[in-house]
Amino acid sequence: MITIEQLLDILKKDHNFREVLDADGYHYHYQGFSFERLSYDSRQVDGKTLFFAKGATFKADYLKEAITNGLQLYISEVDYELGIPVVLVTDIKKAMSLIAMVFYGNPQEKLKLLAFTGTKGKTTAAYFAYHMLKESYKPAMFSTMNTTLDGKTFFKSQLTTPESLDLFAMMAECVTNGMTHLIMEVSSQAYLVDRVYGLTFDVGVFLNISPDHIGPIEHPTFEDYFYHKRLLMENSRAVVINSGMDHFSFLADQVADQEHVFYGPLSDNQITTSQAFSFEAKGQLAGHYDIQLIGHFNQENAMAAGLACLRLGASLADIQKGIAKTRVPGRMEVLTMTNHAKVFVDYAHNGDSLEKLLSVVEEHQTGKLMLILGAPGNKGESRRADFGRVIHQHPNLTVILTADDPNFEDPEDISKEIASHIARPVEIISDREQAIQKAMSLCQGAKDAVIIAGKGADAYQIVKGQQVAYAGDLAIARHYL
């Protein structure tokens, strides 16, 4: 429960309070209200709900519906003049985060918080950290792929970083379940829209940066994207940073006065020997590590997670065991066909991650290589040119372009846009299952491979704003082995 007095105190301390408006005019102080629930969904309110009117598409009609369901007061940046009191604020998203934090009993103070950011690798690194910490502690995890609040049951995540009301409710459930640590992926969008406003992480990890999520509904420029990624560093007590990433010198200067540790080529924490399924490291994680996920970049993700977990109480033995146990749904999953050709299923969904995926496969498979690829509709439009550029640099690839969450766009138009950046012929098969079947039918022997990129473990396609059932790349590939 939270009272109106507590609520106003939170807003005033954050300089986010304008006034309370009701039929009698303006009020600096207010009383007589207490709330047992928080909501930003007008369909889920009653007389004891504190409702947040948020979003560029919010309509007064939503509020009218809530009032008919008993709503007595709401928080907003706008007075909709509907006859009930309104708490007016300058920034509704910041208000949501700080109020939710207090309403749910400040769960962030009862958990050790570890956050990963980066253009790619967040989910893999989060899974590594989860398995490392699980050796001696009780970690919960919020990731793009799956969320667990109790370490036993997993459910599909809706957002990389949940909305603040959901985030703190879930954190409180983690505390109730006896969890000791929480591992999170923190997206640039989470900072852009203040989902984690007011939250300080025990350790923040910056894996890498490359142009992505740049478009009309995301970040307008790379500078804006990079700035919002860096906010995790400002909001972490200690940081772990990849010294091999672009703009590392800037980040090193930024965190000079913070507790920090670097890994990669310009640091003392490096991988000294790398094999397909093992590596040796020097520095704080010196030792031998077995790993199921192939690729040097996955070994670096394991290093990043290990350095973070070392600070959070994990032993080197915990880290070694955790790395050896980690598998990630939809990340570098490998199947073998009856003719011994390989099928690689991976979530690679931007130019940089596609380049790394192709390089790893080419290292191990020297025959005919088939790539299945698409790009999402109505977001990250810059990826299409990036995909074309990467494919152009791998002339031995046979390419089939297909649907990948086309949303409100025509998947064939998206494929044609990607193809316009490739200087050789490619095939377009918009039905993703047919594209996979065709590619697999072209494999003849153990040196050949099909690379299915983009959707990973997703069992849906986003079409016209809705999630439409889709068997999933892995399930389809298994069917045609």
Swiss-Prot record:
Q: Where is this motif: L-lysine recognition motif?
A: 404-407
Q: Which reaction does it catalyse?
A: UDP-N-acetyl-alpha-D-muramoyl-L-alanyl-D-glutamate + L-lysine + ATP = UDP-N-acetyl-alpha-D-muramoyl-L-alanyl-gamma-D-glutamyl-L-lysine + ADP + phosphate + H(+)
Gene Ontology BP term (one): cell wall organization
UniProt lists the gene as murE
Q: In which pathway does it act?
A: Cell wall biogenesis; peptidoglycan biosynthesis
**From what organism does this protein derive?**
Streptococcus pyogenes serotype M28 (strain MGAS6180)
Source organism, top-level taxon: Bacteria
Keywords from the named record: ATP-binding, Cell cycle, Cell division, Cell shape, Cell wall biogenesis/degradation, Cytoplasm, Ligase, Nucleotide-binding, Peptidoglycan synthesis
Q: What is this protein called?
A: UDP-N-acetylmuramoyl-L-alanyl-D-glutamate--L-lysine ligase
